[in-house]
């Protein structure tokens, strides 16, 4: 087979690119991917004779059939869902305990489910924290379909679980019994073995040492590592915990040296590496980067090097892990490997390593922008420094301590990890915010990647490079500063947030959502959570290239917005914060704002916020119950907008009886006592957008149809985020 592969009539890297376009054309139903595949086929016809083209088309047909079969299986599984589940087998290494919340992945009826359960007692929590074996759980629960993305460029939980082979989630209401089980399934036994290793480390080593040991050896990070996780992410070096080539190489070399010392021949060792690779991949949770790296190592021992090695790895991944390239981890892992393969031969000495680090950072930048919308320039230097520390010092040290722990746990090195975390905190304080590039669309992404590839090709003849560099800069600028106006109402689960930006780059943010109310709990029930602002608002703004918010307006004095506001201030530069007089009178809130050195001033009736070549005017700043709240009105492009804040419509109508609006942006709390029709008869808008709180329902009279009033109603709980876009007139689009 290796001879057939080596004699393939076209460059194998060309074949892998051809199949990659075909892969995305089928799995993503992307017109751009189909266009790219056809373009490469046309190039193939021009550069190779018919006989060779026929062989390539045959290979494309075989892989295309495999892709279509996998796609069909996924669609079939997503449509033929089960109605109930009575027994689930726990996969131990997927257990996550966060306060009184338990989640894990379980098998039932040949399907995989993501399972949630609210723990009832501290003893039950400890039982699951120490659980390491396979158990069959008899239960009562409710099945549901995972949630789709709620905001533009937001995390699509349903699609993510789909790439993991999961199509339903299960929420347990009651556990009847748990029975220990045995299995011949290799994956299940490796899951149990990995869990045993994690629990052993947690039991015998203190934090933070235990977190680094589970992270670097097993690819497992607990919720108690959340703070450091955020710091590593903000510095752009969280990938140090993503097990990849360096870790795989370390353990593979250690394994080979051990058996060679025992006298095993190279030929026999070559085949013994296969079961080792299976066990090691299972112990790391079948991580995408580990599997990719292991495949490259296995192919290398059969003589495949460089681009041939990378190409065959991609082809094998198409077969054994069909969803690999649908995940961010899979794409980034292969992108890094490809860049390393292309530049690896040119590295020589420290200068070469620095050059390689720069080239990798530049080459991966478009893909990082696509997934994360930002880039931390400090990561180039920090990766260079900390990679050496993690891979050359911590990894061997932790491996040795883990092995010795079965004889006697040595915990005296914990101070090193405490020092490391203090250094990370200090560096985080010194570092600047990441550069926000925005999320390029697929067309821009492809243009960026092609342009960078051309620059690499012209690296020895740089006459054409300036034009390509200028083109790349323009693409990044268009992504960061879209040449369009927008008004976006985000789905914030609690409260609301409206983002406005015009073609000149002027930005206004109305409200930031509210912190979800949390019941007071005992210490064992407290859990680490991330705010809605971090999950929804901040990622969206960064995806649109926003680094500065010129004006942030809090339309009411609700203190629940304060926590979100402080998080926004850490992520973006804030020009000024406009609040009600009542907010200024709240000493506790103002003290927190002053500590953050934020510019805060009151907003008054009659004040205008200029944007879109026009303005929004504050027409009211007090509700019927004398509570401070702001309503704004103005003509933006071709339509008049009314933003009601928390002011009741009837109260507003008494003050402005002749007011009419084409578009009303309101919050559910405003109209919670009214039906849809009663609310919209007041202003008779053409379009009404309602921000609906997650745990509330908006009333609607039976038999009444809002369309009869000529009013289109968009609710965030049904449509997700709603966005108005345009140059001279508004076009509306929704997430769902």
What are these model-derived regions, one by one?
Residues 9-11, 245, 286, 330, ...:
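Conformational gate/switch positions in structured elements
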Residues 341-440:
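Alpha-helical transmembrane segments of multi-pass integral membrane proteins
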Residues 24-27, 42-46, 105-108, 198-205, ...:
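Alpha-helix C-terminal capping segments
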Residues 29-50, 54-60, 170, 228-382, ...:
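Hydrophobic alpha-helical transmembrane segments in multi-pass membrane proteins
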Residues 1-77, 292, 445, 733-735:
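N-terminal leader/targeting segments
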Residues 2-5, 63-239, 535-539, 548, ...:
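Membrane-interface helix/helix-cap signal primarily in integral membrane proteins
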Residues 128, 133, 137-142, 182, ...:
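Non-globular, low-confidence helical/coil segments that flank catalytic cores
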